[in-house]
UniProtKB/Swiss-Prot annotation:
Keywords: Blood coagulation cascade activating toxin, Fibrinogenolytic toxin, Glycoprotein, Hemostasis impairing toxin, Hydrolase, Protease, Secreted, Serine protease, Toxin. Residues 1-30 form the Peptidase S1 domain. Monomer. GO terms for molecular function: serine-type peptidase activity; toxin activity. It comes from Lachesis muta rhombeata. Thrombin-like snake venom serine protease that specifically hydrolyzes the Aalpha chain of fibrinogen (FGA). Exhibits strong N-p-tosyl-L-arginine methyl esterase activity, and hydrolyzes tripeptide nitroanilide derivatives weakly or not at all. This is Thrombin-like enzyme LMR-47.
Amino acid sequence: VIGGDECNINEHRFLVALYDGLSGTFLCGG
């Protein structure tokens, strides 16, 4: 997960801009 707590998909899943399925990482837009 990139961005730490800012990327917490449980609390800020609406801020997740992109999900890279190839590397399994979340890219946050917020």
